Amino acid sequence: MNKLFVGSEIGQLRRVILHRPERALSHLTPTNCHNLLFDDVLSVEKALLEHDQFVKTLENQDVDVLLLQDLLEQTLENPEAKEWLLKHQISHYRFGPTFANQIRVFLLEHSNKELASILLGGLAFIELPFKAPSMLQQLSDPFDFVIAPLPNHLFTRDTSCWIYGGVSINPMAKAARKRESNHLRAIYRWHPLFSHHDFARYFEDENRYYDNATIEGGDVLVIGKGNVLVGISERTTPQGIENLAKQLFRTHQAKQVIAIKLPEDRSCMHLDTVMTHMDHNVFSVYPRVIDKNMGCWSITPCGEQHLDIKEMPNFQNVLMSALELDNLNIITTGGDSYEAEREQWHDANNVLTIKPGVVVAYERNTYTNEKYDKAGIHVLPITGDELGRGRGGARCMSCPIERDGI
């Protein structure tokens, strides 16, 4: 098996990318948090302690944890990578020609460790030691950001997702997250862990405007046996799914993409906030959103250039057929109607499967975790009182790059 390979949602998890977003979280305020796609300001100290616990939990299960900031710092050791990244992140069109050049010169004075921290965590105008002949600088408040922080990098699942033997470097839906993709492009292109391997790359062209073809990894479930399940959501569009499907089929990395329609609502912004795969025939679902009658389409290749797209009448039957199963064990969100809604909001259904029947989940979702336990699912609990306020659970916060198939 290629070391860079994700063959399922439930096979043995071997290696993941996580991000510990200290600088970015410290730049969140009540004034800017909504523009940065957070509902509230997190306690930085508590969030980092919770993230450290998450890392330790994975390492105790023999999962190799790579941190995004370390990968970016190591990538910046390559002069070509550094030049490319600064060219695209500090462009003339974003800052104006004179100001952009001076920002780049200033950033090049920093160590790779400091530069990685700034690119991920942000930089305010007041931190610049120079005054440029720039209207942008002159018109900006000193505490505005020259380089906006990227706190959503916490959710490494979204920006890139490995699908069998390839990786999708996703065109993000929201402006606050679009810069994230170039960090992953640089890492996958130049970091020694990836640059010496041959693997398929989707949406890799940084110069292409992908328009309405947006896709985020939280909507992508690699359910195994050559099938991919994708949610049509507020972040992932039909155009994005069809373009991904075409690339998967062209590179022979999948035989079928199953698309299901989600409500365009923040409480279920991605498929994995309402549905995750826990064991061979076991799924966690939020029943107010996921049911057998929801809109469902099967996408398969039609020759070399076209897609065969069929609307399907029963989602559960499509899922069982794809996985070659006779039945499904559906575990719904726990508690009464009020408790289930609260626990889904706090990512009760967003679990990270370590191996069949073993998952990492927030300990606060007691009603749902109890149902998992009764169904024979072993829960590795982590604290998520702060991290969960970012609207993401263990699956959201992890990007597997090596996982066994089924």
From Swiss-Prot:
User: Which GO cellular component does the record give, naming just one?
Assistant: cytoplasm
Keyword list (alphabetical) reads: Arginine metabolism, Cytoplasm, Hydrolase
Listed SUPFAM superfamilies: Pentein (SSF55909)
Question: What HAMAP family does the annotation carry?
Answer: Arg_deiminase
InterPro entries reported in the protein's UniProt record: Arg_deiminase (IPR003876)
Output the Gene3D superfamilies linked to this UniProt entry.
Arginine deiminase, L-arginine/glycine Amidinotransferase, Chain A
Top-level taxonomic group: Bacteria
This protein's species is Aliivibrio fischeri (strain ATCC 700601 / ES114)
Catalytic residue positions: 396 (amidino-cysteine intermediate)
The protein's location, in the record's own words, is: Cytoplasm
Q: Which PANTHER family match?
A: ARGININE DEIMINASE
Q: What is its main location?
A: cytoplasm
Provide the reaction this enzyme catalyses.
Answer: L-arginine + H2O = L-citrulline + NH4(+)
- The answer to keyword Transmembrane applying to this record is no
Family, as annotated: Belongs to the arginine deiminase family.
What EC designation does it have?
A: 3.5.3.6
Its pathway is:
Amino-acid degradation; L-arginine degradation via ADI pathway; carbamoyl phosphate from L-arginine: step 1/2
Q: Name one GO biological process term.
A: arginine catabolic process to ornithine
A single Gene Ontology molecular function, please?
Answer: arginine deiminase activity
Q: List the disulfide bonds.
A: none
Q: What is this protein called?
A: Arginine deiminase
